[in-house]
Amino acid sequence: MHNISRRKFLVGTTKSIGLVAGFSLVPNILSAKEAINNKRWDHQLFLTMDTKGTATVHITKTEMGQHIGTALAQIVAEELEINWDDVKIDYPDSHKKWGLMITGSSWSINWTFDRNSRIGASARIALIEAGANLMSVNKDDCYAKESKVIHKLTNKFVTYSEILTRKSINRIFSEEELKAIKLKKFGEYRIIGKSLPSLDVPEKINGTAKYGIDAFIPNMVYGKIIPWPTRYGSKPINVDDKEAKKIPGYVGVYVNKDDPTKVNSSYVIALAETFWGAEKAAKAIKVKWD
């Protein structure tokens, strides 16, 4: 058996999931000078806003037809009090700073709802403070709605775009401050649960969307999981890849015995230089399961 080590597999191939668990809400904010030069405000790790007032939510879950990017962006936008037309999404790299980047079992909303809500809410608070300062009014007399900070006593307002154009926001929230933010109640939602245009549809229609099969980096290999007989308890006790070695481009086999999600026992992956090579190798490899 041509076995590939865990380290070699992760270093030498593209990864569809991140294997570092946990996340931090501690801000990844640019300095005032960097913010001006880059024309953007990085609030927390998963949200960036620019001087047009556009909010880009960084999605670290995989889009598989369920429009997860739109759903996660709705959570941020709800507390941010921003117009839906001012919201975008993107899919960042697989750097470990993003935490566990796995998608499945309806985890995405469950695991990130509170986090995304507090990201949006803290950004709203920072914008209200900056907007009140621009209008020379008390921040406690202001509220945010539809991409604007409004002074309750005079109805005077400044848009998020104006605020981000004229101010450099360096507001940092501690973990304690984030946890103390009062979030909206179910009956107060105006974005969550509403039928809104999906943010990823235009790219899918015009052909610019990048799918997993489109990904390519030099020297990458393709992997094909060999199904196990049962989800729990199945362990490979012998892997015979003699026939797979006859397939052009076959690289080896990776046996995973430490699933980071803890929802599967272990699995075997056939590796090859091409997609179809991996498909053929997976069928040729014989696995004896316990």
Residue spans of the language-model regions?
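Cofactor-binding beta-sheet edge motifs in enzyme active sites
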Residues: 2-23, 33-290
